[in-house]
């Protein structure tokens, strides 16, 4: 009789990190306010809103962290299967992405008038395929914030490979890796500032040259942030969830972020957009991934609920806002006097409904047919 073969125990599922989900709500709202508000309305928080574009870099870094937090152990044990992972991520990403394109169909009329016929045809094909971000001129075609989903899709594609890369086992080596990835993230912004490829000596958020768009919207410049997040998950695994260290890290990250954003107008814009804040994002994430006063605040149930709809809010907000205001809905209903606050409420309501009625049912259906 052959000896029994003992299979390796399945990797335990990681615990949830509700405070980070709550933080996603604030980051998504900050992008909404950045696009559609006057930062001065927010008093002491004005510097955060005025530099709301940095929330996108935060999302990309946290994407690497969350994926590694959930999948690194499975990759090490051999349980991570790339096709299964891709289906899981696609079921989360694409239904809402496609719904947002349907909501944004009216934007194609405007795109037709400002693009060449070749550009328009390329945009119509590339955007549903999550490829538009690879073309600087087409990255914001059809749905402006959707370029980040092209970047995310690329990161999802490579994640099963890069998560298996050998990384240091000790905190010191991991810290060196984080530092090197941060420096790598600064290479392209520094080159842009040095070479002035668009002919702009002092680029800012309104600079719209080809090379600035390549720096802001194409996937490669954001890869160091994603990899930084993966390594950060290894650092996180070595720190106790309880204790004052996490609290101090979180406080240091939040204070550092506020300080840098307060002086945001004096910081090099390409670096701010593409990775300068990685270390401070990391401190904030490590702090909120613990059990302390800050994580309890961001883990407040309503914040977490909105954080779960943050992707829907992000991908829908730009064109849904324009649709609300171009339709005359607020004037016809007499709600215009409550604008913009009523518009923010409508965006949040639309995001939550999209999550409940489209994202989650579609996710369950796609996963069921793949089993």
Model-derived features: positions:
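Membrane-interface junctions at the ends of membrane-embedded or membrane-associated helices
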Residues: 72-79, 165-173, 233-247, 289-305, ...
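Conserved beta-strand->loop/alpha-helix structural units within folded catalytic cores of enzymes
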Residues: 23, 28-31, 63, 94-98, ...
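C-terminal "closing" transmembrane helix and its immediate cytosolic amphipathic cap
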Residues: 1-11, 166, 296-304, 318-371
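Aromatic-enriched alpha-helical transmembrane segments of multi-pass intramembrane proteins
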Residues: 122-147, 153, 157-277, 318, ...
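Juxtamembrane loop-transmembrane helix junctions in multi-pass integral membrane proteins
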Residues: 12-18, 41-50, 85, 89, ...
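Transmembrane alpha-helical segments and their boundary/interface "anchor" motifs
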Residues: 53-56, 72-108, 118-127, 153-156, ...
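Alpha-helical transmembrane segments of multipass membrane proteins
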Residues: 100, 104, 184-189, 281, ...
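Functionally critical transmembrane alpha-helices in membrane proteins and complexes, commonly lining
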Residues: 15-73, 91-101, 122-136, 279-284, ...
């Amino acid at each position: 009789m052959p000896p029994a073969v003992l299979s390796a125990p399945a990797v335990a599922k990681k615990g949830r990190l509700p405070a980070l989900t709550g933080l996603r709500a604030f980051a998504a709202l900050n992008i909404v306010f950045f696009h559609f508000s006057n930062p001065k309305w927010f008093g002491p928080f004005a510097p955060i809103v005025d530099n709301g574009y940095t929330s996108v870099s935060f999302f990309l870094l946290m994407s690497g962290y969350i994926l590694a937090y959930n999948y690194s152990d499975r990759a090490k044990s051999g349980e991570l299967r790339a096709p299964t992972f891709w289906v899981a991520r696609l079921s989360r990403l694409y239904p809402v992405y496609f719904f947002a394109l349907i909501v944004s169909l009216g934007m194609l009329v405007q795109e037709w008038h400002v693009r060449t016929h070749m550009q328009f045809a390329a945009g119509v094909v590339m955007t549903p395929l999550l490829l538009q971000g690879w073309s600087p001129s087409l990255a914001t075609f059809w749905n402006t914030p959707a370029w980040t989903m092209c970047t995310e899709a690329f990161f999802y594609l490579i994640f099963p490979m890069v998560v298996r890369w050998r990384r240091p086992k000790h905190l010191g080596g991991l810290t060196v890796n984080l530092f090197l990835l941060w420096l790598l993230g600064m290479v392209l912004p520094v080159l842009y500032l040095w070479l002035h490829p668009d002919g702009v000596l002092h680029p800012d958020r309104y600079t719209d040259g080809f090379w600035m768009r390549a720096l802001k919207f194409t996937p490669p410049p954001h890869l160091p942030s994603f990899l930084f997040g993966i390594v950060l998950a290894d650092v996180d695994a070595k720190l106790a969830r309880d204790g004052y260290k996490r609290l101090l890290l979180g406080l240091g990250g939040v204070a550092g972020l506020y300080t840098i954003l307060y002086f945001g107008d004096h910081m090099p814009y390409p670096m701010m957009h593409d990775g300068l804040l990685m270390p401070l994002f990391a401190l904030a994430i490590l702090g909120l991934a613990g059990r302390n006063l800050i994580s309890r605040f961001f883990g407040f149930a309503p914040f977490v609920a909105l954080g779960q709809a943050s992707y829907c809010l992000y991908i829908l907000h730009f064109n849904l806002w324009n649709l609300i205001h171009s339709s005359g809905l607020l004037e016809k209903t007499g709600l215009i006097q409550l604008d913009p606050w009523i518009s923010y409420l409508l965006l949040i309501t639309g995001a939550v409904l999209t999550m409940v009625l489209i994202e989650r049912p579609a996710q369950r259906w796609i996963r069921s047919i793949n089993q």
